[in-house]
Regions:
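Short N-terminal segments immediately surrounding and downstream of signal-peptide cleavage
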Residues: 22-38
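Classic N-terminal secretory signal peptides
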Residues: 1-22
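General structural signal for alpha-helix termini and helix-helix connectors
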Residues: 12-14, 37-41
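Generic hydrophobic secondary-structure packing signal
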Residues: 17, 24-27, 93
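Compact alpha-helical subdomains of small soluble proteins
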Residues: 42, 46-100
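Secreted/luminal cysteine- and crosslink-motif detector
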Residues: 6-9, 29, 98
Length: 100
């Protein structure tokens, strides 16, 4: 899980508009919110193909962070449900993002 998560964080480091416009902490915070929303969608048993629309409907982050949703969904949906229930994916994402 950590290996896949790190590769996703590296991919988001390339987000041109978001990374340059916002501070690193703010950007990582928004990315963590997206990860948390996807985790909650999984816990709410939203089907994987409907997650993007479901998460966008309740988005509280800037619109440009919606591009992260299709990249994060497989990361969350490939995890075992017990791991999704027990772990705080938003906090894990933010921690790894800030380390980059």
């Amino acid at each position: 899980m950590r290996k896949l998560c790190v590769s996703c964080v590296v991919a988001f480091g390339v987000m041109s508009g978001a990374a340059s416009a916002a501070s690193k902490a703010e950007s990582c915070g928004y990315q963590a919110q997206v990860a948390g929303a996807i985790q909650q969608a999984r816990l709410d048993r939203v089907r994987e193909r409907k997650v993007e629309a479901h998460v966008k409907a309740a988005a509280t982050w800037p619109e440009n962070y919606n591009t992260a949703i299709p990249l994060m969904v497989p990361w969350v949906y490939q995890m075992k449900m017990r791991d999704v229930r027990k772990q705080d994916l938003a906090a894990a994402w933010k921690e790894l993002c800030l380390q980059q």
